[in-house]
Amino acid sequence: MSGRRRAYPQPQYATGPAEMATPPAPNQFQQQQPVQQPVQQYGVDQMQGQFQQMNVGGVGPTGVPPAPQYSYQQPGQPQQSPQLSYDPYQPQPQANTGVYGQGMGGVPPSAVPAGGAGYGGYGQQNNIGLGAQLNALYTTDLSRDLPPPIAELSFQPPPITLPDNATLIPASKTANATPEYFRSTLNVVPTNSSLLKKSKLPLAIVVNPYNALKIENENVPVTCDTVISRCRRCRGYINPFVTLAENGRRWRCNFCNLLNDIPSAFDYDEISGQVKNKFDRVELNHSVVEFIAPKEYMARAPQPIVYTFIIDVSVHAIQSGLTGTITRTILESLDRIPNENKTARVSFIGVDSNLHYIRFNEGLEGTEILVVADIDEPFLPSPGGLLVNLDENREAIEKLLLDFPSYFENNANQGFALGPALKAGHKMISNIGGKLVCFAATLPNIGEGKLSVRDEASVAGKAKEAKALLAPADSFYKSFAVTCNSSQVTVDLFLTSSAYQDVATLSNLARYTAGQTHFYPAWTSNKYEDVAKLSKEVSDHLSQDIALEAVLRVRGSTGFRMSSFYGNFFNRSSDLCSFPTFPRDQSYLIEMSIEETINKPVVYFQAAVLHSTCFGERRIRVMNLALPTSSKLVDIYASADQLAIANYFTHKAIEKALSSSLPEAREYLIARVVDILNVYRKELVAGNVSGASPLQISTNLRMLPLLLFCLTKHLAFRGERVPSDHRAAALNNLGSSPIPQLIKSIYPTVYSLHNMPDTCGLPGVKEDEDDEEGAGAEIDVVLPDPINDSKASWENYGLYLIDNGSELFLWVSGNVVPGLVQDLFGTENLYEIPTGKTELPEFSLEESEFNYRVRQIIGKIREQNDSIIWKNLYVVVGASSNEPIEISQQRDLMALRMWASSCLVEDKTGSEPSYRDFLTSLKSKVSQ
């Protein structure tokens, strides 16, 4: 094995799938012409002159630049980064023109419009008054956008362009929320409901109040006092978009237009005791801010963080190793539980057919187990000692967790009374609130909430599958969850079993209490990778800086109504979402309706989360979003956010699947693509020429058909037979994932490793855009650029890494170069490679640079501060013509190949068509 950098020879193939990946002809994108607008006075000739003046390369004679070529891999060359390369989910600096800015589209209004060095669809043309210009619309043909330019999946939404005087602080860079926190499906809002209906586009907002598991990984400003100014009528919070009146003594609400008094303490600094400039206050400068709440926002003192651990101790849990793994993980995570003010409390209940309470003797190291056999009417066997302070009882808790598995090591009880255990845990903490964290390896089979195995074989693949297998089998779990919500109690589930667990029913516990259901099929402690994944995710789950006893309310300008809410919470009233605890790794979607004609050039939305921090402080996190309006369909389409729209349609498809059937959910998604293409063809294609391609769409929406097509092939919706627990878990994940994770789940990321640039897998300098000297900042591992999810972009001798958001697949092609196998695995024999769930051997940089770089890439992908998911690695060896017969007949390897291949969503899989075939079928549907 050599430490030198090896250049792996690439065999030349005269024919093969890889030939399909050739780039398009240079004139392929000449159809990208701006949509003609009769009222527009900003002509193409004028645009051409400005482009030439700016000396932007690649501008054609018509003034419209060709489509960017970086989305396609050139023959013999590794795929390169887009010209504007940045992390799409990190906050970006905004332009100084009142516009959402470079972080939201790559170019300010004065720079290159669609198809140039920025995003292939955003130029500013339409004047909405007061100096603001909306995005111009450029058309592309989906049938010629093959392979699809997937780099655009990592681009920011279209820029939000506002009048120069839209903010109280002129040219504020931080007044409008970034999409990491608050984004709309439409960055230009229709002025009336008929226009919205005509567009066939949804109007909804995506709220992600927290985008990191730990507070220190966020940069949200906090007010330095408890002065909060709110509108007397609509109760909106003062924000960067209000206007001042009467020499700054009053402010006009940007939601309902009411004049309100500014508090006398608004320009007084309590810390220094000095008068301060009110314009320096964070709530007037920042779109996302946290207020420290005064006492009137508290119904009681902020609650401490409370965890009740409900642990399966039945024979299945003992034999699989779940009980021992969980208690050891909790023990190792005690220091990670947020406990800054030493008020955290914990309790433990072991569950088989009985309830095993753990009582701590105050001040003593010993504990005792109190067994309650009456599961019909569960009760607390002791008035005290069950729920104890973590800090004060640390030694006893540590000893309990060390000894806990031995208490049940010979247990042969096959019962699992989850329902009674939940009721007991709720009774224990209902007067305080907190979390019930359940670890189960067994289907609840005794007591209230008893479940039985459903007959999957008789309904799998049929229209009634969803109602028979995905509907809750027992109403107890939803009704109990609603009770928990009113008591400020969240339920989280960690389900580990190779047998049926009825995830569809149990997940109601988490859905209505703002929790989450984590599913680990075929988990066993005999597999190191299984233990590592469960332990890592449980530990990160316990370490989250969760918010407590929280509510979320979203407000909008006059004329808007919040009509539907999606996510894991419970609607306490028509517009108030209740969260006993607020997780930091989930997202929420609110659909809006337009109730009256909007006559203002800008409308506003505000989301507020009233909560208690895990260190005992009552706060309100407020997020603000301002959007321009338009009465023109062209403006609506030019500023549509395709990723947010995909998120919306995902929620609607989940709703359709659970209320109707899986086939209807798939048909719904395809019908939405057809609707949008029909509207675009009839209303927005220049001249509406008969015989024009039916697959024309705006460049900023050209990934939407791909995403919705791939969604129909997702585990949650696909027509093939899928175990109901797996399907239910997939539906849960889709319904709560933030947009970055959602998109990766729908369209997995594939990296080509055998031909990656020399810089990949090694530390590089991540540019700091705020550093004027360009010295750079954070040292980070460089990742390869993704390639399309299709075998057409693969080589028969390649090495590929697939990231589907939940797992990683390392695909070693059957004709791989032996030297690559040697450098990566330490053997030249391809069939000596350990396949399946495993880890790569660890070689130092000197021993094998290639092995080191690949492991660094995998480590970087796994490294995330916004999710608890730990991605297991599966090594897959592809088929080859000289493969030994005994290898070809291995069922596990065949299943693994099929699983990994299902991530190549652009290809034909089973009965599902390829993306190319899908587009062909769309032509007839759109032309009808």
Swiss-Prot record:
Signal peptide: none
Keyword annotations of the record: Cytoplasm, Cytoplasmic vesicle, Endoplasmic reticulum, ER-Golgi transport, Golgi apparatus, Membrane, Metal-binding, Protein transport, Transport, Zinc
Oligomer and partners: The COPII coat is composed of at least 5 proteins: the SEC23/24 complex, the SEC13/31 complex, and the protein SAR1. Golgi apparatus membrane; Peripheral membrane protein; Cytoplasmic side.
Annotated GO MF terms: SNARE binding; zinc ion binding
Subcellular location: Cytoplasm; Cytoplasmic vesicle, COPII-coated vesicle membrane; Endoplasmic reticulum membrane; Golgi apparatus membrane
Cytoplasm listed as a keyword: yes
Residues the record lists as binding Zn(2+): C231, C234, C253, C256
GO biological process, one term: COPII-coated vesicle cargo loading
GO CC terms, sorted: cis-Golgi network; COPII vesicle coat; endoplasmic reticulum exit site; endoplasmic reticulum membrane; equatorial cell cortex; Golgi membrane
Mode of membrane association: Peripheral membrane protein
Primary role: Component of the coat protein complex II (COPII) which promotes the formation of transport vesicles from the endoplasmic reticulum (ER). The coat has two main functions, the physical deformation of the endoplasmic reticulum membrane into vesicles and the selection of cargo molecules.
Keyword match Secreted: no
Chief location bin: cytoplasm
Family affiliation: Belongs to the SEC23/SEC24 family. SEC24 subfamily.
Name of the protein: Protein transport protein SEC24
Classification via InterPro entries: ADF-H/Gelsolin-like_dom_sf (IPR029006), Gelsolin-like_dom (IPR007123), Gelsolin-like_dom_sf (IPR036180), Sec23/24_helical_dom (IPR006900), Sec23/24_helical_dom_sf (IPR036175), Sec23/24_trunk_dom (IPR006896), Sec23_24_beta_S (IPR012990), SEC23_SEC24_subfamily (IPR050550)
Region annotated Disordered, chain positions: 1-104
UniProt region (Zinc finger-like), positions on chain: 231-256
PANTHER family reported for this sequence: SEC24-RELATED PROTEIN, SECRETORY 24AB, ISOFORM A
Compositional bias segments (type: Low complexity): 27-48, 69-86
